[in-house]
Amino acid sequence: MTKFSEFGLDEKIVKSVNRMGFEEATPIQEKTIPLGLEGKDLIGQAQTGTGKTAAFGLPMIHKIDQKSNNVQALIIAPTRELAIQVSEELYKLSYDKHVRVLAVYGGSDISRQIRSLKKNPQIVVGTPGRILDHINRRTLKLDHVETLVLDEADEMLNMGFIDDIETILKEVPAERQTLLFSATMPDPIRRIGERFMHSPELIRIKAKEMTALLIEQFFVKVHEKEKFDVLSRLLDVQAPELAIVFGRTKRRVDELSRALDMRGYVAEGIHGDLTQAKRMSVLRKFKEGKIDVLVATDVAARGLDISGVTHVYNYDIPQDPESYVHRIGRTGRAGKEGMAITFVQPREMGYLRIVEETTKKRMQPLQAPTWDEAFAGQLRVATEKIQEAITEENLADYKTFANELLEKYDATDIAAAMLKMLAKEPDKTPVHITEERPLPSRGGGGYKGKNGKGGKGGGYRGGSGKGGSYRDRNNSGKGRRSGGGSGGGSGSGGGGNRDRRGGGEQRSGGNKGNYSQKSK
């Protein structure tokens, strides 16, 4: 791996990168940064979470003329969330060079953006619609742009932004450097490369590199009506630090977040129908740890850069395999382990095989925990919390009252009462989740991607679109919920039950199982 100090970047940029805690480049950065510094056009096929913002951002910042008041670089992103995330990262990367970075996007006060544009940003990040709006108002001038980046171009294609992008490209000088990043390479994206780029270099990060090798991937075969109870029990057993639950539709997200809240989990949802202010508020609370479970659609979560996500639950298997890679890419980042669990209805097993072909990794079958196992996991984590308090906390102020209790009650009864207070008993509160049909079975139809092109395999047709860290529900104050944990029983994780796909079926319980250990 190459160190950032070896690329020949401005020393101020290297200082900023080191401040962020990065020393060695990721594969996409190692391949992109030298070409970016040379001014070459390039097409990068890479997923979110591979470090591509720094890959195009570092050469861009290196070439910015600090004395110029012109917009010298433009990044076009499909969503407001991604535009904000990219601008924040560019700000950090350019902190010591003092480059002015601005994000412009819909759903925000345009007059405030106009005032910010008058302060002469040198890098502008924005969504296609809002960039065009500013161009038409003559509040954004692009005649001095030297570097243009199209980020997540395939997603912009899916969202119908290609015409807007072509209009924007005509406003930028022909003599420029253009960098295009896309998870997939459908024909319309290739045509943009042919029409608007000069002999671009192609950089491809292979699927096995994109699938986050540190992510453990499991599937649970479950009927639709049983999904929510299975999700509840998994959350109780595993007690993830931060979790994202993916639903296929906006209605699904609303119902899941409401149902999780009814059962005491600190959960909120995001999807495209929420106001920008609401979406940013939810994301801010999730990043700050005030929300333990974020429920999201694919589009709403695209491009999110949230550290600390330990578990991703695919409540619905995604309609195209690329979306699966994006979903699980929310976890297992920055060298940390993550876990992805996908719920699959019996009629959807063909979809599972196509996802596995895309990721080049076989998912392990997982048996859903029982209510007893979920409760055993709660008790185990409560026990761990007590043990941690005994070894790590200063208990001198409490010993007088503890001795008084011991004079009145048996020590075992006192310990049992503590466990009862800390452990969450199984919550079977009735909830309403509208049942959705499984994805249609396509026996032998082959995989048809977003452009309808045939592929290998049968049974899949892609769509056109795209422990104890929970808050304590039993106590007031700022304490964390003691639920979840290591799982019940003393089983060993790997089971002997084999399904027709082969491989041992993992149990969600088991103190020693690699599946059930509490996330650290």
UniProtKB/Swiss-Prot annotation:
Keyword RNA-binding: yes
Region (Disordered): 428-520
Top-level EC class as recorded in UniProt: hydrolase
Binding-site list for ATP: A46, Q47, T48, G49, T50, G51, K52, T53
InterPro entries (UniProt xref): DEAD/DEAH_box_helicase_dom, DEAD_box_RNA_helicases, DEAD_helicase_CshA, Helicase_ATP-bd, Helicase_C-like, P-loop_NTPase, RNA-helicase_DEAD-box_CS, RNA_helicase_DEAD_Q_motif
Quaternary assembly: Oligomerizes, may be a member of the RNA degradosome.
Protein name: ATP-dependent RNA helicase CshA
Lineage: Bacteria, Bacillati, Bacillota, Bacilli, Bacillales
